[in-house]
């Protein structure tokens, strides 16, 4: 899927990791692409016949793959995790789940910057969603420097991924009427001390999410100091509208021009000229590439759970392998 294929590519780019195989439930074009990229395919037992009829060779079942790996990165759709967690537990292997699952599935949620150590040596962990990852990348450094009294965030969410022809709306704005949205509690699974409220709207776009953030700070900040706090955070890219980046469209054009794999923008993009501090209140906009921002977090989570190295070293290695400018 969207995240799984990217994680497989990112892991294969690391010097200290090996992708043993990837799983698919049906012999789609993505299965062929996975084989083209050199990945061995595995599938649930019930899908073996489908692959045989399509003449797509597989290396075995999901259970077979579990017997060959140290850790599984589970990128199945939300709410499927409990079923596969039982499979991984029976096999005695570690597993990482994604933000579509509840925090309660693992009891640990992961972010490279904010709580890398919490997953150290764990059998199961969960990388939070794309939007939550985006919020943590900027909220954490601001909280460390100024303290956050309260956070108010409105998320303008893409309606569907670019490769999704089934979701919508395609001509409208759809509010999430159940409030607050899940994003605030998800942030609190990693930063439980932050008082945060979130609202969300789905918009007729496919390429990125947009956040408008208003923070009440414990200590006053200047605009310049706030910009520096955000700029110095790893996996945040500052842009300026005067350079021509006025929307998410230009951000994705920038990513294509950087020749990233699949044109991915792993960093959270913040408009420097859209950051404004007024006493204890801070305002800013940020854009989130929902297809890719969690990918480097999954790589770092592997190292934490396998007790490979500390957070700074892992982030540096991951960033170098993926072409992300590194900041301490």
Give the predicted meaning of each segment.
Residues 263-328:
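NAD(P)-dependent Rossmann-like dehydrogenase/reductase catalytic/cofactor-binding core
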Residues 8, 136-143, 184-188, 224-227, ...:
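Predominant activation on well-ordered alpha-helical scaffold segments within soluble catalytic domains
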Residues 1-164, 312-318, 323-326:
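N-terminal Rossmann-like NAD(P) cofactor-binding subdomain of oxidoreductases
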Residues 81-83, 247, 291:
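Intrinsic-disorder/low-complexity, polar/charged segments
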Residues 12, 143, 231, 303-306, ...:
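Hydrophobic/aromatic-lined pockets within catalytic cores
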Residues 2-62, 66, 147-150, 154-286:
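C-terminal substrate-binding/catalytic lobe of Rossmann-fold NAD(P)-dependent oxidoreductases
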């Amino acid at each position: 899927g969207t995240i799984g294929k990217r994680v497989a590519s990112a892991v294969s780019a690391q010097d200290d990791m090996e992708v043993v195989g990837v799983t698919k439930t049906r012999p789609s074009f993505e299965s062929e692409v996975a084989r083209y990229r050199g990945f061995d395919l595995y599938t649930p037992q019930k899908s073996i016949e489908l692959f045989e009829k399509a003449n797509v060779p597989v290396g075995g079942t999901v259970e077979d793959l579990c017997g060959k790996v140290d850790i599984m990165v589970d990128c199945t759709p939300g709410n499927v995790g409990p079923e596969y967690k039982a499979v991984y537990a029976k096999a005695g292997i570690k597993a990482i789940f994604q933000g579509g699952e509840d925090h309660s599935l693992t009891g640990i949620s992961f972010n490279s910057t904010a709580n890398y150590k919490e997953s150290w040596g764990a059998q199961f962990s969960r990388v939070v969603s794309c939007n939550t990852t985006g919020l943590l990348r900027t909220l954490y450094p601001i909280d460390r420097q100024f303290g956050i009294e309260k956070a108010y965030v409105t998320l303008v969410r893409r309606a569907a991924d670019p490769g999704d022809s089934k979701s919508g709306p395609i001509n409208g704005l759809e509010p999430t009427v159940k409030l607050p949205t899940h994003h605030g509690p998800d942030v609190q699974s990693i930063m439980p001390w932050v008082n945060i409220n979130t609202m969300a709207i789905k918009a007729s776009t496919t390429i990125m999410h947009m956040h408008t953030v208003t923070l009440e700070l414990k200590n006053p900040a200047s605009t310049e100091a706030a910009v520096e706090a955000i700029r110095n955070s790893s996996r945040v890219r500052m842009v300026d509208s005067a350079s021509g980046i006025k929307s998410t469209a230009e951000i994705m054009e920038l990513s294509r021009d950087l020749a990233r794999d699949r044109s991915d923008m792993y960093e959270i993009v913040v408009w420097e000229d859209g950051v404004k501090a007024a006493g204890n209140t801070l305002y800013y906009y940020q854009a989130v590439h929902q297809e890719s921002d969690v990918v480097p977090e999954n790589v770092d989570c592997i190292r934490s759970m396998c007790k490979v190295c500390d957070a700074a070293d892992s982030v540096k290695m991951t960033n170098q392998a993926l072409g992300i400018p590194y900041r301490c």
